[in-house]
């Protein structure tokens, strides 16, 4: 492998022996900046280790759904089917490349090892831990695109020094790991506690919509966490 993660093979040539690259570089330009924060990194490692815990028999993603009187019940958003074999990856091993030579690097990614491509019942999972900043415009645009192709995107907001908050948490009971979230993206639609949140207007530009989400959806969640 060379520095671009490409396979190189020797070419026998009596005059100028050399190596030939097979294929193109795996990744181009990264979209978005990484969180340079110990709390963020510790939380990513914590979630990753628990998801890969061999004692875990099942994984569930859930959310609190609130009634008008603020009582709530916990509802499951997604749980892999029994015939699934989910593998979990983080950071460099969770990269997703796009055709215009760019890529994003989710904190954690998961997929069913038995499927070549994600399906509605077997989606790919993206978990973004948010401590110091939320996804930038270009990154969010890619996450939105992916959510339309059987990817679930879960936003996990935390405060400094913590691995959970009032918005989300991880719990394990009887071999079942439950990751509770409040904010997530599925099927091109943002959700907050089970309810659709501010769908993009028919004539609204993506930039205007994202700016609104910056000042409401993401900022409010970071403040609450």
Protein language model features and the residues they cover:
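Active-site metal-binding core of divalent-cation-utilizing nuclease and nuclease-like domains
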Residues: 58-123
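Non-catalytic C-terminal interaction segments of nucleic acid-processing enzymes
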Residues: 133, 151-225
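Basic, amphipathic alpha-helical patches used to engage nucleic acids or provide basic targeting signals
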Residues: 119-163
